[in-house]
């Protein structure tokens, strides 16, 4: 099972960080998961190095229960490998 970490930056912003396979569908699947919940990221950063895609997504204004649920769902995306 893969894992995603949700790091609180402050009381209203959550940062999700994960490593994934360098596949064209990984980032769109992560963003689609947010869009289906009506969430718009404040910041998205992705960098491919060799065979790993490092992704950081920040979202503002999430309740803690929602933040935890989104993190679990991101970890279930095919191609997501691990927390960094």
Each PLM stretch: what is its role?
Residues 1-84:
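A conserved regulatory-domain signal marking ACT and ACT-like small-molecule sensing domains
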């Amino acid at each position: 099972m893969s894992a995603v970490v949700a790091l609180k930056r402050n009381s209203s912003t959550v940062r999700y960080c994960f490593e994934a396979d360098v596949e064209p569908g990984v980032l769109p699947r992560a963003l689609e998961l947010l869009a289906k919940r009506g969430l718009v990221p404040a910041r998205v950063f992705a960098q491919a190095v060799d065979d790993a895609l490092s992704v950081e997504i920040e979202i503002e204004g999430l309740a803690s229960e929602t933040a935890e649920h989104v993190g679990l769902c991101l970890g279930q995306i095919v191609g997501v490998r691990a927390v960094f």
